[in-house]
Amino acid sequence: MIDSDGFRANVGIIICNRFGQVMWARRFGQHSWQFPQGGVDEGESAEQAMYRELYEEVGLRPEHVQVLTSTRSWLRYRLPKRLIRQDSKPLCIGQKQKWFLLQLKSQESAIDLAASGHPEFDDWRWVSYWYPVRQVVSFKRDVYRKVMKEFAPTALPFQAQENTQGGRRRGRRR
């Protein structure tokens, strides 16, 4: 679904483990890594799209995860001109995304990148929480930064608590 401004409705998914790490996936046959994401179909809610994409891209079902939170608003990024399909109607100039933070509740073995029969990723790994902001393709970086900042108090409760105390650790100096 592309809106009147040319932005395609999309959901982004951040899956975290109990150690505060996030799932980072490599695009099939490419050297680029990102969080799972995908379009919202007509008549589908953002949450329904998230669960569909969760299965299609990483093979997880609702019982494998717990939804911790979602972004308060839709976040947008523009595609670089070289990626815009000029002959496409309606013209899509970027994505507007609703993001979801999920906690993996099952074993890692439940992750199956080929579950849908059309894998979008060919590898994945756990990375530190802020790592994706530095590593994602440049045109998505601002959205990733905003999402990670919004989700940090939920995903990293101890870090968020430290930040409210001026970022200092208690204890003696060395």
Swiss-Prot record:
Gene3D superfamilies: Nucleoside Triphosphate Pyrophosphohydrolase (3.90.79.10). It holds the Pfam family NUDIX. Its cofactor is a divalent metal cation. GO terms for biological process: mRNA catabolic process. GO terms for cellular component: cytoplasm. Coiled coil: none annotated. Its EC number is 3.6.1.-. CDD domains: NUDIX_Ap4A_hydrolase_plant_like. Accelerates the degradation of transcripts by removing pyrophosphate from the 5'-end of triphosphorylated RNA, leading to a more labile monophosphorylated state that can stimulate subsequent ribonuclease cleavage. This is RNA pyrophosphohydrolase. It comes from Shewanella loihica (strain ATCC BAA-1088 / PV-4).
